[in-house]
């Protein structure tokens, strides 16, 4: 039977949970994960104190002036009167605040003194700080924002994916890559909803213990979907760069390689991360990343993909500028390249370049980082759907044709007006609806 939380410990845990949000994957942490760490420390402490009392020979030892004890957050070894005992900050505080402080007690003739300094001050958590309540409110607002963002992105992505799948004239390598990107954003949104539902549905102790394996699997799925999303953003950059830099290449062969890379490479890194977590940091539901070296198994490849996309973006702009300055380039090609340049500029946030700014950001910039990664990042799928589908001239033409055919079939005596003027329609008709006439 696990002990209940004392009021002082509850007061200490509240700001700890807030601080944990900056180290988790984008939502408020589970109370039972923190409790699990506390219980592990308690069990370890009681075992050490038991061995201390019995000694190496297994015989009962005389009790010193101050008997060893567990005070609900720290383990204090036995001591003789007149000595000051120092212990590290509790593990659950160190892993959440990344601060290595110390706590002290004096052993007197009357027993242990009070702990000094107070754990909340020595270990980097100020329970009297009025900003804790504001931060909690801010994080809850962020949660609402990213829930709305992922929901709207999910709806728009499903519609966009349905459109690209429904019209055969839109089936080509470029749109196949777009569809894989849509699926990665859909999985990212769904995994986020599943994570929130499983991890934060209950803080009851029995629930936490019974569903620990399930919530770890959810976190593995969540990390895979995040990495797959970044992988397909990189594939978009690689394909666009290849299209501009190489005159002739086998799109079918490249597509097979892109698919293997986009879905396969994240599986490798996530599997390595899961193995490392299981053997080296099997704490809670794996939603708190205290061991930086293990977390870099996930974070490193993501940052590398962002840097590669940034380099690709710079080179894409260089190629476009060179083509625009070439005198041999014809007028219609100049117009095409200008449209391509404008489209490429819109890809800056999609390539995740802004994440580089926060890759090694200090703790005081964490709230700004969370805003960009959660609030704005959740709408990324919506922007992708609009850019790659709803603003695509070929898609608009195919939808317009389908609408006109349906309207003529249902209302033959009432012809429908065209969505666009005749000049635009004629221009799109000349393209024959092929996927190769535009980049996005």
Curated annotation (Swiss-Prot):
Residues 168-174, 240-254, 316-340, 392-440 are cytoplasmic. It holds the Pfam family HRM. One of its GO terms (cellular component) is cytoplasmic microtubule. The chain crosses the membrane at residues 142-167, 175-195, 217-239, 255-276, 292-315, 341-356, 368-391. InterPro entries: GPCR_2, GPCR_2-like_7TM, GPCR_2_extracell_dom_sf, GPCR_2_extracellular_dom, GPCR_2_secretin-like, GPCR_2_secretin-like_CS, GPCR_2_secretin_rcpt, Secretin_7TM. One of its GO terms (biological process) is G protein-coupled receptor signaling pathway. Its main location: membrane. SUPFAM superfamilies: Family A G protein-coupled receptor-like, Hormone receptor domain. Residues 1-22 form the signal peptide. Keywords: Cell membrane, Disulfide bond, G-protein coupled receptor, Glycoprotein, Membrane, Phosphoprotein, Receptor, Signal, Transducer, Transmembrane, Transmembrane helix. Residues 23-141, 196-216, 277-291, 357-367 are extracellular. It is a multi-pass membrane protein. Disulfide bonds join 45-75, 66-107, 89-123, 215-285. Glycans are attached at residues 72, 100, 106, 128, 291. PROSITE patterns: G_PROTEIN_RECEP_F2_1 (PS00649), G_PROTEIN_RECEP_F2_2 (PS00650), G_PROTEIN_RECEP_F2_3 (PS50227), G_PROTEIN_RECEP_F2_4 (PS50261). It is found in: Cell membrane; Basolateral cell membrane. GO terms for molecular function: G protein-coupled peptide receptor activity; peptide hormone binding; secretin receptor activity. Phosphorylated on Ser and Thr residues at the cytoplasmic C-terminus by G protein-coupled receptor kinases (GRKs). PANTHER family: PDF RECEPTOR-LIKE PROTEIN-RELATED, SECRETIN RECEPTOR. Belongs to the G-protein coupled receptor 2 family. G protein-coupled receptor activated by secretin (SCT), which is involved in different processes such as regulation of the pH of the duodenal content, food intake and water homeostasis. Ligand binding causes a conformation change that triggers signaling via guanine nucleotide-binding proteins (G proteins) and activates cAMP-dependent pathway. Upon binding to secretin, regulates the pH of the duodenum by (1) inhibiting the secretion of gastric acid from the parietal cells of the stomach and (2) stimulating the production of bicarbonate (NaHCO(3)) from the ductal cells of the pancreas. This is Secretin receptor. It comes from Homo sapiens. The gene is SCTR.
């Amino acid at each position: 039977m696990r002990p209940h939380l004392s009021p002082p410990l509850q007061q200490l845990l509240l700001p700890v949970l807030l601080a944990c949000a900056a180290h988790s994957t984008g939502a408020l942490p589970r109370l039972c994960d923190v409790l699990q760490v506390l219980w592990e420390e308690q069990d370890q402490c009681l075992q050490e104190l038991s061995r201390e009392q019995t000694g190496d020979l297994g015989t009962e030892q005389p009790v010193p002036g101050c008997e060893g004890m567990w005070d609900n957050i720290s383990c204090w070894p036995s001591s003789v009167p007149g000595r000051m005992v120092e212990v590290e900050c509790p593990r659950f505080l160190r892993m959440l605040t990344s601060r290595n402080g110390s706590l002290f007690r004096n052993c007197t003739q009357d027993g242990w003194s009070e702990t000094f300094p107070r754990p909340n001050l020595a270990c980097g958590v100020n329970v009297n700080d009025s900003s804790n309540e504001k931060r909690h409110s801010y994080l809850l607002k962020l949660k609402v924002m990213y829930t709305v963002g992922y929901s709207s992105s999910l709806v728009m992505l499903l519609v966009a994916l349905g459109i690209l799948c429904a019209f055969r004239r839109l089936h080509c390598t470029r749109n196949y890559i777009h569809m894989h990107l849509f699926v990665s954003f859909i999985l990212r949104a769904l995994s986020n909803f599943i994570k929130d539902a499983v991890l934060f549905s209950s803080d009851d102790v029995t629930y936490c213990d019974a569903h620990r394996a399930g919530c770890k699997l959810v976190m593995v799925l969540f990390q895979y979907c995040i990495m797959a999303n970044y992988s397909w953003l990189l594939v978009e950059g690689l394909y666009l760069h290849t299209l501009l830099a190489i005159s002739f290449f086998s799109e079918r062969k490249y597509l097979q390689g892109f698919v293997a890379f986009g879905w396969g490479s994240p599986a490798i890194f996530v599997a390595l991360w899961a193995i490392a977590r299981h053997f080296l940091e099997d704490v809670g539901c794996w939603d708190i990343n205290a061991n930086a070296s293990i977390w870099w198994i996930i974070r490193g490849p993501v940052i590398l993909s962002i840097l590669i996309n940034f380099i690709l973006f710079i080179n894409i702009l260089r190629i476009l500028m060179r083509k625009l300055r070439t005198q041999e380039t014809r007028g219609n090609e100049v117009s095409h390249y200008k449209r391509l340049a404008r489209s490429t500029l819109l890809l800056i946030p999609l390539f995740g370049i802004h994440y580089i700014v926060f890759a090694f950001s200090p703790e005081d910039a964490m709230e700004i980082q969370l805003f960009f990664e959660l609030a704005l990042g959740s709408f990324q799928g919506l922007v992708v759907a609009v850019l790659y589908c709803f603003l695509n001239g070929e898609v608009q033409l195919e939808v317009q044709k389908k609408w006109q055919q349906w309207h003529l079939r249902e209302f033959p005596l009432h012809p429908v007006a065209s969505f666009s003027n005749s000049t635009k329609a004629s221009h799109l008709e000349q393209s024959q609806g092929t996927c190769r006439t535009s980049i996005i």
